[in-house]
């Protein structure tokens, strides 16, 4: 399947530009108001006590701002942030090297934390609880454990698959936050702020149109903004008006609901099953996608907006999906 413009993965060429568009203060961070309020209280209390923050876990679909909010936390705490991803921590020595280089009150951000191996988790437990690193030297009867004290630090874990975290690891986070999809009005504000940083004039209705097609996700909103800006440049227009925006979005294959070819193929597969549950492995094989992409990228937005039901036997299209695709339902169809 061709590359999706609404893909939620961060592309290499986007990274530096995304950093420049990242909010650096609470007042510039749009959305997630409940999380922001709780964090501001925790940060204020920690600074008054002159302590590090409790360890915290952010979970939810990709592209909702877990990394951005972690950078703001570090700035508010006036400390450093070290960013890594679980797949990069292959051996206990990798984790030990990271932990022993942290300073007091530093923040360690681990993305995809659900992918840590059990052996790495075992090393992490005493580090999180007691700020202590237990290193085993040797093997068998001659093995020795060396204990190394660590400075108080804050671990921030980010995951799209919170259900895959082991209970012992999940229980060691003092705070846990579920990131929510953004409203169109929040996304429109994010788009306008980003356009200003890019020195790009944009009409209000154009920002609204991009927001409407961004699947509730800032990462997609910013990606669409940059692609529409390209179309405006080719058209020799300094202004992103509605006509250019609509033309660009239609050319990119993103419809009024934010669905692209992959979403419609997924929904068609379910709707044509006429009420019979379709298993994840069947969907993945039919779409030539891996199961994690189906679960983490395609399904969350569709689930949140009522286009499918998950059952023990598989996925089922809802009447909303049948109405969208104009595929009639059999009278005997039931979700149960």
From Swiss-Prot:
UniProt-annotated binding residues for Mg(2+): 67
Chain positions covered by the region annotation Small ATPAse domain (RuvB-S): 183-253
Swiss-Prot/TrEMBL catalytic activity: ATP + H2O = ADP + phosphate + H(+)
Residue span of region Large ATPase domain (RuvB-L): 1-182
Pfam families: AAA_lid_4 (PF17864), RuvB_C (PF05491), RuvB_N (PF05496)
EC number(s) given by UniProt: 3.6.4.-
A single GO BP: DNA recombination
Binding site for ATP: 21-22, 63, 66-68, 129-131, 172, 182, 219
GO molecular function: ATP binding; ATP hydrolysis activity; four-way junction DNA binding; four-way junction helicase activity
Region (Head domain (RuvB-H)): 256-336
SMART domains cross-referenced by the UniProt entry: AAA
Single GO cellular component term: cytoplasm
Entry remark concerning the domains of this protein: Has 3 domains, the large (RuvB-L) and small ATPase (RuvB-S) domains and the C-terminal head (RuvB-H) domain. The head domain binds DNA, while the ATPase domains jointly bind ATP, ADP or are empty depending on the state of the subunit in the translocation cycle. During a single DNA translocation step the structure of each domain remains the same, but their relative positions change.
Family, similarity comment: Belongs to the RuvB family.
PANTHER family: HOLLIDAY JUNCTION BRANCH MIGRATION COMPLEX SUBUNIT RUVB, PTHR42848
Protein name (Swiss-Prot/TrEMBL): Holliday junction branch migration complex subunit RuvB
Organism the protein comes from: Helicobacter acinonychis (strain Sheeba)
